[in-house]
Amino acid sequence: MTKNKELTKKEMLEIFNRRYACKKYDKTKVVSDEDFMAIIEAGRLSPSSFGLEPWKFILVKNEEMLNDMREFAWGAINSLNGASHIVMVLARKGVTGDSDYFERIGKEIKNISEENLKIRKEFFTKFQKEHFKLLESERALFDWASKQTYIAMVNMMNMAAALGIDSCAIEGFNK
């Protein structure tokens, strides 16, 4: 292993060690647009099963919406108060081989030919139906997408830590 790889390994471990779940934010500290976009890009570039990226990122800026969220955010009130950016990382529902989303990702994002898209669709459907039984319930399918979404969220949080920015994953929403 070269000296540069050792340094990189050491730096990465320091970032992971520094990252923690921040429970209270300083309202006077604002994340720059450049840093925020780097955090979002880390999420966007995250790996996912079949490259489908079954997630959506929503920046919540609307104070009225934040107030509405507080009503359902069990245990997250301090995090919602004071954070300079609130990003909702949502899992997409209904991502199947037959979905418009699957086709759009294949054609428009991945530039896959019709012939190859058909092959991928058949393979993906077999994966979901036979190997992982994801098509037996909406819940199973959503749980699969949620697991993919966590990959993006963790990469975003690690990028934030690398930039010296605190973050916290919040799951406790009642609605």
Language-model segment annotations:
Residues 1-175:
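Acidic, surface-exposed loops and disordered segments
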